[in-house]
Amino acid sequence: MAIIESTIKDNYALYCGDNMEVMKEFPDNKIGLSIYSPPFCGLYNYSSDPRDDSNCDSYQQFFAAYEFKVRELFRITMPGRISAVHCMDVPGVGNGETAKMGCGANVGTGLIDFPGDIIRLHEKCGFIYCGRRHIWKEPLGVRLRTMAKGLAHQQIVEDSTLCDVATADQLLMFRKKGDNPIPVAHPTGLHRYAGERVMPHELQVFKGFKGKQTENRYSHWIWRQYASSFWDDIRIDNVLPYEESRDTDDEKHCHPLQLDVIERAVILWSNEGEIVFTPYMGVGSEVFGAVINNRKGIGAELKATYYKQAVRNLAKSDEYVHEQMLIK
């Protein structure tokens, strides 16, 4: 493998290098789950490396490169298992072959259905699209981060037809065709809730309930939150450290996927001991989420500063698990 650097432990492997070089070493039907956030088709540039999928000249060029990754993910995923993609609408006009990126800070900028094009690509590569979750974002927080004038109250004063939406993130679910050889079963239901809501105290007695599962009110409550198509209970700031990973000329965008989102995906769509893979590792969030839930995590990241931050973050995974055990 043309890998720049690697860190291999019993329960995780981190690679600094091209994700295609990492994936080609996997045998067919090996991965229990993949979860990742791809570069948003050039909306943010993370490096000048020509292998970096964020470093593209057009929306179409991004998808031409991304298709190779999706096909490899299809090959290495177990039949019947899930590939989860975190994404959102992006500023611009048109879709597919006509799409042209715009600037999100400009008033009146349209939106490109980036999730829709991801869905169509996955279907082209053999995946079955089987649902999406929307992840709520606080409007003022989005306004302050992006400085989009269309989210400012002043735009209401001037012309509210040009107001924007604090666009929700989306987690798309794709299932590989075929029968799942190892069901992801939960004989005593779900044991832990990842989110900001407070579970009613009287339900705690049902945690790990071994009786008739129709009576497991603890797990039922968690599942109602997870089954919703709109996740408005994600702790937005529950992310891994990332500030040290920034280069001096970095975009301001770097913001890892929330651990609540990752934990839900890992628990729902993989078994303990299975491999969870992320081709766009960033600072290691998906690998971390796999490891702390007794899975094996593998991640590939091209950018050296992100990789080094991932190494630091994963080194603290045992400490995190210990702290969580003390909280229980």
Language-model region placement:
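PRPP-dependent phosphoribosyltransferase catalytic core
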Residues: 308-328
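Core catalytic lobe of class I
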Residues: 2-309, 327
